[in-house]
Amino acid sequence: MAEPDYIEDDNPELIRPQKLINPVKSSRNHQDLHRELLMNQKRGLAPQNKPELQKVMEKRRRDQVIKQKEEEAQKKKSDLEIELLKRQQKLEQLELEKQKLQEEQENAPEFVKVKGNLRRTGQEVAQAQES
């Protein structure tokens, strides 16, 4: 290699370059981290530097496998379990319908409620007269 020309000149006006400080050698924490990474690399435990797309694809594959296992478990359900699920769904539907009816009745205008009360009292009077 060729010698730099600033070594030959003894010009005091020039600023001579100084050797840069190596951060690995100066910091104890950095040295420990570097040593640990080298040991892990030798053992084959290096952190996986996979691209983001590859990580997403692996996650999707795992999710698909889990989903397939759940579906297979559902397919293996007995007739009793299937019937119980159907009944539970019917009960939930009935409860929802009752709630909707109650909400409709509560939200109905006052004159509709009064009309219903008058109709009921009229029917009760008619039944009382017949008996």
From Swiss-Prot:
One of the Pfam families matching this protein, by short name: DUF1151
Record bears the keyword Acetylation: yes
Modified residues (N6-acetyllysine): K50
Tissues expressed in: Expressed in the hippocampus and hypothalamus. Expressed in the pontine nuclei and reticulotegmental nucleus. Expressed in Purkinje cell and nuclear layers of the cerebelum. Expressed in the choroid plexus. Expressed in hippocampal granule neurons of the dente gyrus.
Entry's induction text: Is not up-regulated in the hippocampus by acute social defeat stress or glucocorticoids stimulation.
Cell division among keywords: no
Family statement drawn from the similarity comment of this UniProt entry: Belongs to the FAM107 family.
Designated name of the protein: Protein FAM107B
Protein encoded by which gene: Fam107b
